[in-house]
Amino acid sequence: MVVIEGIKYACERCIRGHRVSSCTHTQQPLIRIKPKGRPATQCLHCREARKNKALHVKCKCGSSSSKHAATCPCYSGGGCICTNKHPQVLPPNSTTTGANGCIVINKAVLDEGSQQQAQQAQQQSQSQQAQQQQQQPQPQASPILQQPQMPTPVHTTNVTTPPVATPTHSHRALSTTPSLSPQPQSPHSPESALKSVNFLGRTNSSSSLSSLHSGRNKNRIEKVRPSHNSLSAASQLANSPSSPFYAVTPPAWVDSPTLVPTGALDASYLQILNDDLSSPLLDSDVFSSLDMEPVAHSNNNHGGIPTGGSRALASTDINFDRFESTSPSSILSSWNLWGGVGGSDAPEMSVAANPSASASASSIQTPPSSNATPEWVQGQQQPCSVSPADVMLPFKRDDQESVFLTEPLYL
């Protein structure tokens, strides 16, 4: 309910529902609330004459003989015209407007006064802020700034510095910034060597660490793409006397000891990784790039390090995408891994041990001596270090990329 100049207004729905006291619908058209009791007559002359609030039903003053005929607004042709039927005959000084004695107001009429007050308050605040800014004194300049600056003496020297070329790209500028590490690492330190080339021949060591630590499932699949530059750099490091790769012990994060040879990381092991993974293999070319020689004891075998059979067949060296057959027997027969019954002519993969690695051979956890018969040879006809249970059925991928198993799967 809205009160304007002592007159109450409410919406039509609240008036019909007798809820005028709780009406807050200011966004809808508002209608004047009539006072309690019978409404006053719409005829001003009759209302003033009778001095009551009775409903004007019929006017008897409209006769021509009446003394009020000239001044009665409802007189027209000898009859009474009620304001409910003809609202246009209302006098201009009437207190009510409209056919039913009600007025209709909008929200704009109600907000007009509040908007004017808000504008006046805003103007006053702006004027006060302007006066305060004018009254505030301007800050004086400090005496230090007012003092004349003394010219700095220029010392001429005969030494000329070469111009520094500014980098054109942002990534070059980032690469030229000095390192924040307090102790720089030497290029031959084990930490830098492990960061540059890891045991699998890849240049990004963080990717191998994340791939080994991220998945807890042991049947992990990883795509191995060794680059030629990283392999050549690793082979040069392995052949040098001061190489940190002599007698490398597998770190703690390596799950299987077959991923790293027990001897030195020499060119023979790198040649295995550098094999062309995209060309298809024939039946007799499976181990063409490897050093195929029978199990023998060399004279350079110091510290119990065997030269032949020192490295078991890692599952990362077999590309299952090269074979189209899905039978394990056909794969074993085509690989020719199991040899004859006696096992004397069975080929064996070996990595040539570096003679200079014998100095640190005492710190290497070596397998049993080659003079004794290994446990996997006793009572079996397969002299190879890979058993038929270690061979997984080959599978194909839609992307036709080389897929390797980082750990052997057992059937």
From Swiss-Prot:
One of its GO terms (molecular function) is DNA-binding transcription factor activity, RNA polymerase II-specific. GO terms for cellular component: nucleus. It comes from Yarrowia lipolytica (strain CLIB 122 / E 150) (Yeast). GO terms for biological process: intracellular copper ion homeostasis; intracellular iron ion homeostasis; positive regulation of transcription by RNA polymerase II. SUPFAM superfamilies: Zinc domain conserved in yeast copper-regulated transcription factors. InterPro entries: Copper_Homeo_Regul, Cu_fist_DNA-bd_dom, Cu_fist_DNA-bd_dom_sf. Transmembrane segments: none annotated. Its main location: nucleus. The lineage of its organism: Eukaryota, Fungi, Dikarya, Ascomycota, Saccharomycotina. It is found in: Nucleus. Residues 1-40 bind DNA. Transcriptional regulator involved in resistance to high copper concentration. Residues 115-190, 205-214, 227-241, 350-370 have a biased composition (Low complexity). Residues 115-241, 348-389 are annotated as: Disordered. This is Copper resistance protein CRF1. It comes from the Eukaryota. Zn(2+) binds at C11, C14, C23, H25. Keywords: Copper, DNA-binding, Metal-binding, Nucleus, Transcription, Transcription regulation, Zinc.
